[in-house]
UniProtKB/Swiss-Prot annotation:
Positions contributing to Zn(2+) 2 binding: C301, C304, H317, H321
Originating organism: Mus musculus
Binding annotation for Zn(2+) 1: C273, C276, H289, H293
Protein name, UniProt field: Zinc finger protein ZFAT
Protein's job: May be involved in transcriptional regulation. Overexpression causes down-regulation of a number of genes involved in the immune response. Some genes are also up-regulated.
Length: 1237
């Protein structure tokens, strides 16, 4: 409507919608039609606006338009080509030139603050130019093409804001534009932003313009009810508002398991803002967006009062103080933001324009092109609509609402790159695969992080196939190399395996002693790589990545870096051992060298070594050609000095290789060829071990990029050579329960079972309120608290309203309020700064894994340690060699046993114990109350454990322990042992108050405690008889030691537990054989042969052991024939000596000593013991592999003379320890060495 003609008349305005009219009756009709339901008074809504006197024009020659233009204080933005428009300035002042100045100034100042606020996201701006370029204003109605007629005013409003800059003011009446601006500038703007409809759901629809894409469409609630708000609204406002809604899109599960053990995510989460209903795919971008609504600006400048909600904006601002700017390469343009420089180059120099498909217009910005198409072309047209959909994808608003679909499994992804990587999963081969566990990755970085999780790499000594655990290695040897000796092959494989050590990992020197140090000195793992020559000599093959061999003691070697072995640690190695000829002879002796690797050394030697290599190359060229393939072994020069070693003819060494099918397997070679040849002694002799044939054992990987990537990752990792002693030491520290799937070690079975379920995906705990399931009970408990409870943990800081159901999130939030964690942490490698310690730790572990933990500790100012890959490390007892879990109660009780402390004491008697549970069980003896009732038979018990054991009797498979004499079965082993007392023919222990008798003193004491608690313990039986008397009454004497047992089952149990033997009757004659190896028993078995009653028989046994070449690997493989030979030898000298003198001959592994104390039949055998397996760590000499030690005694009364028989060594150089055996106590204490003889 036109208002210029009413110079002296009043103009009426509707306060509800800011509608102007010179006729009051028209506004009355308007209010009754539009605002009648609101119950407003017409006189209060319609107000008259009367013009004031216009001040004198200082320049009468110029009109009011020019006067308003001259008042503009802000000029053109830097770099802008737009000219000032008088119409825009009139819009900014919100008045017409015909109106009086004072009224215009007052009205403009009153409406200006609200006019600079976005009606969609409520963000405020300092000027109209920023508001017009705001993303919400530009794309406000991009998704409202099909809107109803009630939104026409809003559509016109947006068109006003998105009006093209080139259109002049004369095209549209000035008053009409003023009216439209006021529609969002006045009071209703706040109403629109405050009455935003909440989102109740999210709908996914297929995108019309892009195949394979899905658009996220939020569904808003219905229109709010007009009328007074309910009284509950005030109470609801008091609840802390989270500010966003979270939606989970269920992912389609895989129809068949993937090659990887991982399962894809079952849900895809998206988020919506509760204030402006915007959709976000990532939570971090939503959190940054929410700061706009909360006016939170945590990033503050330390030099001025500037603050920002986004950290990147603060970084740009700081360049104002530092003077750092980005300069254009084509002109003198400079700016503070790298993004602004990119836009400048595209617009000014590259002349990149966005062309309209329907006319000849072109724009420098996609947003302006979208605005042009909507204003000048019909959005309802099909082609126009498709063009708009494509252009929206070039904006942040359009990309934010787009998901990408997999057309095979219909899974959805937040970005196109993840979808493309996922498509590789449906192929035949993973692009990046792990050869140890079969894990597949679609990124090289993901494979690199995955391989670092494997603590060990076990290599088969025959076929060089790699395994993630020793369990799979044993299974492989048993299934594929069944004809070979399993123990010998397994030991050789352990010696060729290695452990992957991350810098700062959890294999520490204080835990493993000097084992790693010795392994590093005796072995240098060569960094090897592949170079296979094709039939075409002119075609070059790409390098896979050369591995570096650190040569200690070399004068030309570079200083040791983070991954290099220190020169001082391995100075005993001679550099001549690493010559090419030595390596080639080493490889030929083994016969199992793969052609996949190159041997590279960081040496900068001159031409003489190269000439020697050339000579060696000439000598071995013919032998290499007979193998059908050539393998290049290269001692390369340093990267920074010397010519390319590949181009040097003297830098090549050809040796024999394996077939092509084994070319992708790796091995670690010893620097000493003699040690390497000893690993597989029967391979070169053509024995049973033989080289694995290609058809019988094919490596897991073929020649494809995944295998190459895995080898490159393996080459870049730090390694330590493994051996049997180091392996046993690691298992003693970290536990002997090994995970088959990843090689991790555990101490306790409950932890091991829980870990295995992470690989098998066996979920035992299910949520009763949703479909959630978890592996552990704690995860389920945390889920219930977070998702299904109204428990909120509030921040205790004054003035902070933060609350969360997760205690871990609250702990992370509390760091914001601490001054210590507000400091910035800088990466020592790339100098990138982080605000939290966890962020810099994750950054270093991901991007700079070579940084040691000491460096990270210095950066953070405290000692830190990454999560152990092997497992939880145990602590050694300060009094003995036993290991216990770190900070565990078992260690404390063990130390109390050494110190004789029993802190838990009974208040009713003198009983004391070191365990609280034992005290609780003891207190049940003073109580007659039985509170635990069996629901099957009604029997009552005092403790829960007793009830649990009793319930096993009601199950079919509960009685697993059977008597070997009668049909008795028991649910527990102690019950069976108690039953076996009934079958004893001789019972030397008898009660003085009843007819009870038994053959064990402990059973009689238990009888007194239960049946005669007030009587003193007294044995009225004959007590323990001498060995001869017990034998006369049917007892059995141990053939190894002097113990005699009254029953056969006690005798068999003694042989199995103490000596590892079992009785096997062959044709009626009893024979002693080594007991079958069980998982609980150690891998090294000690075989006790027979009795020897004089020195002569002992010497004969030693000679027999020398002929049999007894070693630790073959000790448990001796057949009964060899045992019988030794028995016959010992019996040769037994006729001329006293039969009362009893000694033992034992065959032991290298490095052990056995001390046997001679006793007579009159002495009670329970007062002494046989000490075995005392490791000679204090010896001044090192034992070779074939050393054997047999120790016996010549004195009858006591040990005064010790005879030591050795093979290849001086007996005087060994230290022998003797210790008296003690009676068993409640807590077994580790044996302490006695003074040396």
């Amino acid at each position: 409507m036109e208002t210029r003609t009413a110079e002296n008349t009043a103009i009426f305005m509707c306060k509800c919608c800011n509608l102007f009219s010179p006729n009051q009756s028209e506004l009355v009709t308007h209010v009754s039609e539009k605002h009648g339901e609101e119950g407003v008074n017409v006189d209060d809504v319609i107000i008259p606006l009367r013009p004031l006197n216009t001040p004198e024009n200082p320049n009468p020659s110029k009109g009011g338009d020019e006067f308003l233009v001259m008042k503009r204080k802000r000029g053109r933005p830097k770099g802008s080509t737009k000219k000032p428009s008088t119409e825009e300035e009139v819009v900014e002042n919100l008045v017409s030139p015909s109106e009086d100045g004072p009224l215009a100034t007052e009205e403009g100042s009153r409406l200006a603050p609200s006019s600079l606020e976005c009606s969609k996201c409520c963000r405020k701006f300092s000027n109209t130019r920023q508001l017009r370029k705001h993303i919400c204003i530009i794309v406000l109605n991009l998704g409202e093409e099909d809107g109803d007629a009630g939104n026409e005013s809003d559509l016109d409003l947006e068109k006003t804001y998105k009006e093209d800059d080139r259109e002049k003011a004369s095209k549209r009446p000035r008053a009409q534009k003023t009216e439209k601006v006021q529609k969002i500038s006045g009071k209703e703007a706040g109403q629109l932003s405050g009455a935003k409809k909440p989102i109740i759901s999210v709908v996914l629809t297929a995108h019309e313009a892009i195949p394979g894409a899905t658009k996220i469409i939020p569904v808003e609630a219905g229109p709010p009810e007009t009328g007074a708000p309910p009284p509950e609204t005030t109470a609801a406002d008091l609840v802390p508002r989270r500010g966003y809604q979270e939606y989970a899109i269920q992912q389609t599960p895989y129809e068949q398991p993937m090659k990887s053990s991982r399962l894809g995510p079952t849900q895809l989460k998206i988020f919506t803002c509760e204030y402006c209903n915007k959709v976000f795919k990532f939570k971090h971008s939503l959190q940054a967006h929410l700061r706009i609504h909360t006016n939170e600006k945590p990033y503050k400048c330390s030099q001025c009062s500037y603050a920002s909600a986004i950290k990147a904006n603060l970084n740009v601002h700081l360049r104002k103080h530092t003077g750092e700017k980005f300069a254009c390469d084509y002109c003198s343009f400079t700016c503070l933001s790298k993004g602004h420089l990119k836009v400048h180059i595209e617009r000014v120099h590259k002349k990149i324009k966005q062309h309209c498909r329907f006319c000849k217009k072109k724009y420098s910005d996609v947003k302006n092109l979208i605005k042009h198409i909507r204003d000048m072309h019909d959005p309802q047209d099909k082609k126009v609509k498709e063009a708009l959909d494509e252009l929206r994808l070039m904006t942040r608003e359009g990309k934010r609402q787009l998901l990408y679909d997999c057309h095979i499994c219909e899974r959805k992804f937040k970005n196109e790159l993840d979808r493309d990587r996922h498509m590789l999963v449906h192929g035949d081969k993973w692009p990046f695969a792990c050869e140890l566990c079969g894990h597949g990755a679609t990124k090289y970085q993901a494979l690199e992080l995955h391989v670092r999780k494997h603590p060990f790499v076990y290599v088969c000594a025959l076929c060089l196939k790699k395994f993630v655990s020793s369990i799979r290695l044993r299974s492989h040897i048993r299934e594929v190399h069944g004809a070979a000796q399993e123990t010998l092959v397994f030991t050789s494989s352990i010696n060729q395996s290695f452990c992957l050590l991350e810098p700062g990992g959890d294999i520490q020197q204080e835990a493993l002693g000097d084992q790693l140090q010795l392994a590093a000195e005796e072995f240098v793992c060569p960094e090897i790589d592949v170079r296979k020559e094709e039939a075409c000599p002119g075609e070059a093959q790409p390098e896979v990545g050369l591995r570096e061999l650190v040569v200690p003691g070399d004068a030309h070697a570079p200083p040791p870096g983070p991954l290099a072995t220190p020169q001082s640690e391995s100075s005993s190695l001679s550099p001549c051992k690493l010559e090419t000829t030595v390596v080639s002879s080493d490889l030929n002796s083994l016969g199992v060298v793969s052609d996949d690797f190159l041997l590279k050394s960081d040496t900068s030697s001159a031409e003489p070594p190269a000439a020697a290599e050339a000579t060696s190359d000439t000598q071995h060229r013919d032998s290499a050609q007979t193998q059908g393939e050539e393998v290049t072994l290269l001692l390369a020069k340093a990267k920074s000095a010397g010519p390319d070693p590949e181009s040097s003819p003297g830098g090549r060494q050809k040796v024999g290789a394996l077939p092509a099918s084994e070319s992708d397997s790796s091995t670690c070679l010893r620097a000493n060829p003699t040690e390497a040849s000893d690993l597989l002694p029967t391979v070169t002799d053509g024995g049973d071990l033989g080289v694995c044939q290609p058809d019988s054992c094919t490596p897991s990987s073929e020649h494809h990029p995944g295998s190459t990537a895995f080898m490159k990752v393996l080459d870049s990792l730090q390694k330590k050579q493994m051996n049997t002693s180091l392996c046993e030491r690691i298992r003693k520290v970290y536990g002997d329960l090994e995970c088959e799937y990843c090689g991790k070690l555990f101490w306790y079975q409950v932890h091991f079972d829980m870990h295995v379920r992470t690989h098998t995906r066996e979920h035992l705990y299910y949520c009763s309120q949703c479909h959630y399931s978890s592996i552990t009970k704690n995860c389920l408990k945390r889920h219930v608290i977070q998702k299904h409870s109204n428990i909120l943990l509030k921040c205790p800081t004054d003035g902070c309203d933060y609350s969360t159901p997760d205690k871990y999130k609250l702990q992370a939030h509390l760091k914001v309020h601490t001054e210590l964690d507000k400091r910035s942490y800088s990466c020592p490698v790339c100098e990138k700064s982080f605000s939290e310690d966890r962020l810099i730790k994750s950054h270093i572990k991901t991007n700079h894994p070579e940084v040691s933990m000491n460096t990270i500790s210095e950066v953070l100012g405290r000692r830190v340690q990454l999560k152990g890959l092997i497992g939880k490390r145990a602590m050694k007892c300060p009094y003995c060699d036993f290991y216990f879990m770190k900070n565990g109660s078992d260690l404390q009780r063990h130390i109390w046993a050494h110190e004789g402390v029993k802190p838990f004491k009974c208040s009713l008697c003198e009983y004391a114990t070191r365990s609280k549970s034992n005290l609780k069980a003891h207190m049940n003896r003073h109580s007659t109350e039985k509170t635990h009732l069996c629901d099957m038979c009604g029997k009552k018990f005092k403790s829960k454990g007793t009830l649990k054991s009793h319930k096993l009797l009601h199950t079919s498979d509960g009685k697993q322990f059977k008597c070997t004499v009668c049909d008795y079965t028991a649910a527990q082993k102690p019950q069976l042992l108690r039953h076996m007392e009934q079958h004893a023919s001789f019972k030397p222990f008898r009660c003085a108050h009843c007819h009870y008798s038994c053959n064990i003193s402990g059973s009689l004491k238990r009888h007194y405690n239960r049946k005669h608690p007030n009587e003193e313990y007294t044995n009225v039986g004959s007590g323990e008889l001498a060995a001869e008397a017990l034998i006369q009454q049917g007892g059995l004497k141990c053939p190894v030691c002097s113990f005699v047992y009254g029953t056969k089952w006690e005798f068999n149990r003694h042989l199995k537990n103490k000596h590892g033997l079992k009785v096997v009757e062959i044709d009626g004659d009893p024979k002693w054989e080594p007991a079958a190896e069980t998982p609980e028993e150690p891998s090294t078995q000690y075989l006790y042969i027979t009795e020897a009653e004089d020195v002569q028989g002992t010497q004969a046994a030693v000679a027999a052991l020398q002929d049999l070449r007894y070693t630790s690997e073959s000790g448990d493989r001796l057949d009964p024939t060899a045992v019988n030979i030794l028995q016959q030898i010992i019996e040769l000298g037994s006729e001329t000596h006293d039969a009362a003198a009893v000694a033992s001959v034992v065959a032991m592994a290298p490095g052990t000593v056995t001390v046997v104390k001679q006793v007579t039949d009159e002495e009670p055998s329970s007062n002494h013991t046989v000490m075995i397996q005392e490791t000679l760590q204090q010896a001044s000499v090192e034992l070779a592999e074939q050393h054997h030690l047999v120790v016996s005694s010549d004195d009858v009364e006591g040990i005064e003379t010790v005879t030591v028989y050795t093979q290849g060594g001086e007996a005087s150089e060994f230290i022998v320890y003797v210790q008296e055996a003690v009676q068993p106590v409640e807590e077994q204490v580790g044996e302490q060495p006695a003074p040396e003889l």
